[in-house]
């Protein structure tokens, strides 16, 4: 008997489609609720600069402290769940790229040149360091005008390239990705079931080369890849490794 522990594993395509559809609906509901909550908490002044400042540097608001603790604990257990299910800005960037997909009827998500992408994903760590250094040196990080201009810019970039801000700029994502590297539950590929169609990669908003190596630090646990895999080759599990081709 297979003693490995699986949380999500599919052998029946019909069952898989049904379950993944429900998971995607649940994710949309979660994103929407957390977005509405963020609007209420901030008095409808949703600032991308303020969000970064509060999350990275911190404040004394209990709700922020609890959210940060939950996000970090979740990252250590299951990866960047906060990014894919709870982040209010992730919700907005998700909306704009899905809007482009529907408007232009895209079957494959737009991608950044691979060489550029592989370098740009480290830029968010530079932003994280700069935010911390700015705080330590007493530089004030504020200004709603700047915040909304940046949000508008990243919404446009997110319309062109899915989750641009989340991939390359967000210091919150870079902080959580450090914990996600050691997450207990991981997205895994069974190479014996994979037929190399790369449907999963075409649907991945983070441009992860799933069939080559799943980067757990970049994965936001949106499970779009699992939703389109017709062979059930992907699983989200603990205490197992990728299954190599026999």
Swiss-Prot record:
* Topological type in the membrane: Multi-pass membrane protein
Q: Which InterPro entries match?
A: 4Fe4S_Fe-S-bd, 4Fe4S_Fe_S_CS, Electron_Trans/Redox
Report if keyword Transmembrane helix is assigned.
yes
Start and end of every 4Fe-4S ferredoxin-type domain? 185-213, 210-239
Q: Which residues cross the membrane?
A: 32-52, 69-89, 121-141, 146-166
Q: Tell me where it mainly resides.
A: membrane
Positions annotated to bind [4Fe-4S] cluster 2: 204, 219, 222, 225
Q: Which UniProt keywords apply?
A: 4Fe-4S, Cell membrane, Electron transport, Iron, Iron-sulfur, Membrane, Metal-binding, Repeat, Transmembrane, Transmembrane helix, Transport
Q: Please name the GO terms that the record assigns under molecular function.
A: 4 iron, 4 sulfur cluster binding; metal ion binding; oxidoreductase activity
What protein am I looking at?
A: Uncharacterized protein MJ0749
- Native source species: Methanocaldococcus jannaschii (strain ATCC 43067 / DSM 2661 / JAL-1 / JCM 10045 / NBRC 100440) (Methanococcus jannaschii)
């Amino acid at each position: 008997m297979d003693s490995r522990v699986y949380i999500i594993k599919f052998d029946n395509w019909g069952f898989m489609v049904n379950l993944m559809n429900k998971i995607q609906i649940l994710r949309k509901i979660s994103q929407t609720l957390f977005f509405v909550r963020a609007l209420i908490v901030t008095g409808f002044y949703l600032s991308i600069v303020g969000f970064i400042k509060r999350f990275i540097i911190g404040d004394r608001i209990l709700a922020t402290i609890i959210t940060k603790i939950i996000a970090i604990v979740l990252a250590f257990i299951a990866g960047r769940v906060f990014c894919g299910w709870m982040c209010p800005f992730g919700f907005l960037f998700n909306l704009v790229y899905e809007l482009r997909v529907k408007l232009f009827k895209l079957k494959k998500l737009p991608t950044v040149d691979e060489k550029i992408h592989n370098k740009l994903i480290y830029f968010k760590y530079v932003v994280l360091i700069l935010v911390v250094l700015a705080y330590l040196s007493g530089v004030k990080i504020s200004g709603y005008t700047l915040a909304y201009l940046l949000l508008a810019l990243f919404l446009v970039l997110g319309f062109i390239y899915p989750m641009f801000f989340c991939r390359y700029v967000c210091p919150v994502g870079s902080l959580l990705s450090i914990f996600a590297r050691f997450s207990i539950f991981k997205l895994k590929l069974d190479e014996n079931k994979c037929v190399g169609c790369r449907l999963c990669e075409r649907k991945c908003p983070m441009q992860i080369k799933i069939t080559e190596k799943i980067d757990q630090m970049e994965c936001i646990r949106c499970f779009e890849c699992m939703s389109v895999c017709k062979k059930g080759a992907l699983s989200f599990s603990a205490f197992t490794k990728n299954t190599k081709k026999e």
